[in-house]
Amino acid sequence: VTRPSFVFILADDLGYADLGCYGGRSACSSNLDRMAAEGLRYTDGYSNSPVCSPTRFALATGRWQYRLRGAADEPIASRTARGNPVLGLPPSHPTLASLLRDAGYSTALIGKWHLGFPPHFGPLKSGYQEFFGVMSGGVDYFRHCDSGGKHDLYEGDAEVRCEGYLTDLLSERAAGFVRRQKNKPFLLSLHYTAPHWPWQTREDAEESKRISNIVHLDGGSVQTYLTMIRQLDEGIGRVLAALEETGAAENTLVVFTSDNGGERFSDNWPLVGGKMDLLEGGIRVPYIARWPARLPKGRINRRLAITMDWTATFL
């Protein structure tokens, strides 16, 4: 039996009704809507937490996040976690990436890590053979600096300077990784920072210069937020196109979800609450899965599921 490849796409702070296939009122998610039509859409998919890092711990380990000390910080904050040998995913702990790597898979994380900082923690220490992305919880999309103004863009274990809109950089790297795989199964964890603050589209380079505090309350609008989702969706379209071009699409399980519910400017209708709330709007998120070789098209699944179920499914 030919082993499938896996592409796990994680959005950041996406609301339950932000996508057209979940009732969104704006046409900003054509590729994800098509992916849902070609596969399976869950109505009752939940994130492991209403905030970032704990959900990522659960996804990486397949376990309840609070079995690890680092997940008790909700989320891991740059100001307290840099250099801290405790607040992170222990390299000795088995992960989805390490187990698939040991089974012969190529593994890459493109995007957001947020499970502890070097030198104690990092994607390459936890099963990923390639990494391009950010270590912290939120960065400026153009300057690639965290909320404290520290540069945060890495290639492997080393900081790297790149020009460009972060969502586009991640999409390009992810599509490139897919194209480089030759007759070998792979795990691509594509963990976008969008549409997490700061709210910037690829047309907002000047806004990046204006904003001095990237956290939460400076900048943004509903229209900016929707454009961020559209540009995220365009990037996902490029990755799906790369799967088609290489002939890998048929036997690749592609999953899309969010790490928690939506925050400011998002649409969580008809749910109550949002990010940081242990209410439906904070933990009920979009779940889309496409696997042409195995999953029927256009199905709606109303069973309960949680983030770490995907880990068990892949393994």
Tell me the role of every PLM-derived stretch.
Residues 1-315:
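Formylglycine-dependent sulfatase
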